[in-house]
Amino acid sequence: MEPPAAGNLLEIMDLARTLRQEQLFIQQEQAAFAQLTGAFESNAGTITKLAFVCAQQRQILNELLLARTDQDPLLFCRRASAYDSAQFVDAKQLLPYEHALAYEDLFNYLYNTPYLLALSLATADRLSLLSASQLGQIINTIATGLYGNAINTKDVELLLKLLRELIEIQLLTSEQPRRLLRTNSSSFARLYQRLVESLFSARIFLTAALHAPLMGVLSEHEIWLDLDPHKLMQTFTPKEREKRFGREGDEEYQRNVARFHAETLGKLHSHVQEFVKSLQQSWALFPSSLRWLLQTLSQQLRQSLRHEEQEIRQLLTDLVFTHFISPAIASADLLGIIDVNVSERMRHNLNQIVKLLQRLALNDEDSELVQLMELLMLGQTGEDVVAILPQQSDFERSQLAINQRELAQLVEFFRLLTARDEYDISVEERQRLQRILGRIPKQQVQQQQQTPKDAPDSRESPEKSKKSNKSLMSLGKAKKKLAKGMSFSSGSSNHNPVPVSEPLTNGQANTSNGSGGLGADLEHCSSHSGSNTSLSSCGANMPTTNDPLDMSTSSDPVLVFSLYNAGAKSKLKPLTEEEVLKMNSIGQDGSNLLPAVVTTAPLAPSSNNDDVSSLEAMRRPQDDASIGNSDNLEAISEAAHSVASSLDLEEQQERDVHENEDNLSDMVSANVSGRGTPNISGRDTPSSQVTDGDGAGGDLGHHHGVHARAAANPQMQKMLLSKARSDIEDKFCKFELKKFEGDENVSIISDTWSTDVLASDSENTLDATVSERGDRDRNFSTPLIPSAVVLPGDNNFVVEALARAGRVSGVHGPQLDASDQRSESNWSTDVLASDSEKLAEIDTDDNVSITTKSDTTAPQAAVLDDDDEDEQTPGSSGDGEPDPDRGNGSERSQEDSAFFDAVNSYEDANLYHGASSLARSSVRTSYHVLGGESSFQQQYKCSGADSSGRKTTPLMGTSCMRRQTSAESSISNQSLNLEEPPPPMGKHHHHHREHHHRDYHHHHRERERERERERSALKKKKHQQQEKEHRDLIDFSDCSEDKEELARNRDEEQPPGLVQQLLDMINQDEQTGAVSSSSPNVEHRRISIEQRSAIIDGRRNGILAGSMRRHQSLNYENHEIMLNSMLPKTDDDKQEMLLCVQTQQLQLEERRGSAGLRPEVDGASGIAAAGGSGLKPPTKATGAIPKSISFDASADKDKQTYHRDGERDRERDRERERDRERDRERDRERDRERDHHGAGIFNKLRQGIFKNRRGASAKNASNSSNQSNPAASTSSVQADIRSVSFDPSAGCDNFGTHYCDTSEDILAKYRRKVSSSSEATNSDSTGNGHGVGSTGSVGAAAHLHKHMNGGHIPGVVFGCVKQKLRTVLSRTDLHSGDFRQTSTTSTTMATPLQIYLQIQLAQCISLQRLPQISHVAEALRCLAQLERPQHGQLLAELQRDLERRQSYLQYLMRHRQQLLLRSEQLEQLEARLRGEARSSQRCLLQALVRMYLAWSRQQEKLEQFQAEFAQLRASDERVELTEEFVESLLQELRSSADLQDEWQVDAARVAIERMLLEQMYEQVMFPNEDADVSRDEVLSAHIGKLQRFVHPAHPALCIAQEYLGEAPWTFAQQQLCHMAAYKTPREKLQCIINCISSIMSLLRMSSGRVPAADDLLPVLIYVVIMANPPYLLSTVEYISCFLGKKLEGEDEFYWTLFGSVVKFIKTMDYLD
């Protein structure tokens, strides 16, 4: 019988089926996510283009309505039609690339600086530089192009900020601000009009408030309204006057006139009251954005103390009623509020209503409208606009559409402004604008006439570009009124004017226009003869001689530019499975968490925050291939030649704080143009390690005891390196990994390295920018080689946690902003120079003193002057502004992260000081680019130290590791001994060699301070040695085999600083020469390189599992890595990469078995593996460069082609001597302090480990001690020895022989990408074929196999097998279940799990599924390595994991729902924009037809048609004549207006019918004149009597009981009443169809089924009776006459029903 733990075959089949279902569901959802996300991106572009088309067509309509009568309306129609078929082209494809980038720089600069834009417009208004039409075009370009027609929340916000700035600049300084509000009188008035036209919330408010009263006015057929009825009398003809009032002069005539006056005024008053009542009911819908603008204006006017209260009230009333509500009433059809054609008579009536409303609002202080205005002023006066606008995330605009003519006008506008002294902007802003404009081409004529004033700017610009390359920027230096944005100048474009490209000039040579050219000012500043940049109007004031210009402009393609707007994709990316599961575990284990210092600073309202987000476009995951994954080896080599120094920072920071002609253009060229651009392999790309503190000057940590400023973005610097490309051969020499021939002391500190040039992928940009005092008080350390090289994806959580821990415990420790190192895309996952090449390729002319001696310098202790410190939390900036990176920098929005939901649970820092459950909380994925996990996630993972009050040093304080996803590296190379007390801390010494032209005295002062710091650090060692009992921050509660061991480890007392003592002893012997003859001081580099070559993918992707992840000692560079972290049990293939390293160590141990090492180690500490050096690595907070980092290439300096001057060589020699002296001093000091810690054993251990480094066969010290010291605690040592591979003889690299990577091998490693899939198979980075023929490999494999069979390594095997088993079971299916577990299994010793896999293997072989064959075979092989009881444990674990993943499946469904909702929102937005475009075209055609019929030639035809129509009596003949005349007019219009689209033809036909039947309405509606009217009045009176007793439950109606709940069907009644407002039979019929359709939908809703005709008919009878529409019989005959024979389908059914209802009502009796 099988043990119960092994399960049975049926259970395994059921588990496999469940896993398969889960896998299929996840794959389907992920595929749907990808499809929906792609659709969102395309829809966003479509919406941007539709918004542009809508805005242009609305502008054309406005120009047509305001055009002079001598202008051809057909021209406007052709222009509008051209936009329907406009071709949108990427500007980079049509324009020269550098010109397109210059335009984008200008747009992004203006987009984020509303104050500068407002000042520009106000200056143009004040100086009258342009005509009204020209300035109107500039305003139109800004509103429709730059701000995207204000359909996006972000655009509305910036447009409101622009209006706020115009209020301060224009309205507050004016003596009569009301005059500036008049139409087209100021930029503020123009922009305000554009805003209210574009705001959809304004459209909603106007529709809710005005639709019903408007339809009420239009439904009255013969109504005449006027404030002065006497004027109406003059409009009547004598015949009409006699018909209405009788014979003039009679007494009856006077009475009729008086009654007419009273009725007119009474109707006017009643309609106005309807409007007021409707406004009161809908006032709550008033747009909050407009309300904020009004409140801001009111507040600022009152604060100015220049205007009386009455004047302020009138000005606000003008904004609301005169310029917002009143135009909507008078032109409701043009705004789309109603779809009724408004006749001239009705337009006059509406204008009278508008006048009365304005009079009430302005003059009557007791009116309801005044009270409504007072309501607007209540509430949050002065509230920031960001808090008011709806935070919608359904649409993110990343494109800007503009036609070429508008583009040229805008550029010329700013050229004109910058040339005027009256343009009152700062010098740097003017220079910045001029530089951007200088990169935009002019015409040749303009080049020749370039004024000498502009010439110096062109010459100075390259120099300033070079200076900007030296300095780093801090946008948060000071908060100024001018919201300065980022400059995205490429800095590489030619500053000489370049001829404009051909597409810009096609058809645009004519500069003469109706407004007289550009005006005197424009002509004076620059010549525009033959220029495409003449600021001509778009249609107004333009004679017909300019037709070719307009036609060519309309047919030209529309250019699409990129806006650097953040987060368009970030909010759509789903969380990974690991993230969801870890977020769920946060709440469960919250009681074990340390306090998290949460700094979720709100987003600063200024536009500076856009700079942070705009940089995100440069570091998105899709750009990794060209930016993040650029060849950082070459980048470092190139950067070494920078002549800049950190001393330049303070000189240039103030000057260049906003002058960042950065290298975005270079980066984009790398993306777009590939290697054909000047950006080969990213040499000219910026450092991908970008600090996120740009927006508000986020404060970094305290570096070297000095308060350091926020590191400026290397990406924001201009990285134009003047170094010639002739040294490309030297760069590729880095691939030759030569051996060192001996011990050579070489410094890595270069006098040409700088803190502001290209940095490596492993940098920590902690000391980029310093304050003035910081410049004086510290040495500059280069960021090119960090103190602790960080693997890609490592977020330096330890540093942040320890910096915070030092602050919590009362010591001013280095403070880090984790966002500076948080970006994942800034790590090159392909190159990994710091992993495999040890940065050996850095130009060795700058590696002055690379020492191979393992320095014993300890990390610098955190010694800070309290006076120097301005301590701030990482989430705050140096200026006291909120750090925008906290609120906005994350590419994933905060609402998408569940970490923010749990933030309030960990506020009390005193409640959680125990062990931290960080193992299940530390998750992130590769797309978290801008510190994407949010500040809570970051600080939660790295929460501070325990509250014991002891001093916590940056390295050995309470630290934490984290679990990582498959896209991240698994190990930080910091020496993390998580369960040991801190060893003595000393100052880590290093010098930053300044450039040779720097002041020598500065170096002298720096060295003096360094010595003082060293002496002070030595005094603190003994005190720091006494710090003990650091708690383990990793919660191992989810790994059962770790619990007992963890408890046992904590109970045992440990000697302090065990590993440090070991390393010190090693270094002591190295210094005294007690080493083998094979020069181990150099040879340890070989092991380091070879190991990293073997495990480069393993550390990048490999993840340990189970208890094997604890106390794992891996050597990385020269730093010891003590892993006490819980890493996720995910990628099984990645496990093998790390296991290969373990195999190496076992192989090396076999060769060194005679050493007999017996380290006295207990279970809580691991011993250094091969390659460990004595260097105690400096903390990441210092940014220091350890002296022991070696570069293989530096051993061959005599072979290099670099040249060094004598002064530099002499300085290097002196530096080396000082270094050696300090090293010896520190060694002797440590030797004296540690004599009592078993030096003999460590000496032997050191000899065993480092004896033969060149052969790369080091011994695993822990294994050696395990073999030679049987008395040692077996379980403890076993817990430390986690070296295993599943296949002892395959897949592991052996380094018994000298191993050297070939150049092709290293290049192959660079080409490989990190797999983000948990099932990805990562190949060994060095290949399986190199160096396998070692004689020691067989012994090592046998030893490894013995360890596995002995159960020494259950954690790694168990976790990997579980992952592989899940992969196999979730990808297989059982075609036949005809298998049962029998007694034969006991003879074969196979468990049911193995039986199931054997079935699957045979099935895959039978079906020839090769990938599954390999998977199943691997799973079987792995199972064979486990004990039989563990098979049952595997199944139990898989079942528990399946239950835990239910939350992930639920998350997938919720995310799918969110995406579906967002998809629908985008579709509705697109439909709305298309509807607006169609509405504009309909209004345009309507106006065109009205003007067309008003021509004298058409008037004659119309009069002739009316005469013929009057002679006909038969209805059929009249209908036929009408249709023929409409078709003739349509054909003429179609050919004249160039109507191509079928929709346009139909719209034109409807417009002609409307105009024609409106003029002949009396004749077609009442052909028998008074007889028809009398008949309608009789029926109306009859229905009025029926209304008195008819009710829904009346027995004569027989309405079913279930339908009575929806009575009285108000909307249906309204539709029938609105029939009188429409004039054409088709429109009247549509009202009837709408009425019946609404009834049907209500009946269906109440009954749940489709209602029958018998259900509908009684309800329709009741609705017609209660509505009692006017002229009912005439309407029925009118529709039957013109449409009766043309109806079909549903329309015919509804019309038949309605006709039968009218007949039934005519015969109804008045019975109760």
From Swiss-Prot:
Primary location group: membrane
Keyword annotations: Coiled coil, Endocytosis, GTPase activation, Guanine-nucleotide releasing factor, Membrane, Phosphoprotein
CC per GO annotation: cytosol; endocytic vesicle; membrane
Composition bias type Low complexity, residue spans: 527-537, 1257-1276, 1317-1327
Site keyed Arginine finger: positions: R182
Transmembrane stretches, start-end: none
Family annotation (SMART domains): VPS9
A GO biological process held by the record: endocytosis
Subcellular location: Membrane
Comp. bias (Polar residues): 503-513, 666-691, 847-859, 961-977
Domain Ras-GAP: 157-392
Record flagged with keyword Endoplasmic reticulum: no
Modification Phosphoserine, positions: S645, S646, S834, S890, S893, S1154
Region entry Disordered, spans: 438-541, 639-704, 812-895, 938-1056, 1150-1277, 1317-1338
Comp. bias regions, Basic and acidic residues: 454-466, 652-661, 883-895, 1007-1017, 1024-1034, 1194-1238
Record-linked Pfam families: RasGAP (PF00616), VPS9 (PF02204)
Name by which UniProt lists this protein: Receptor-mediated endocytosis protein 6 homolog
Organism encoding this protein: Drosophila melanogaster
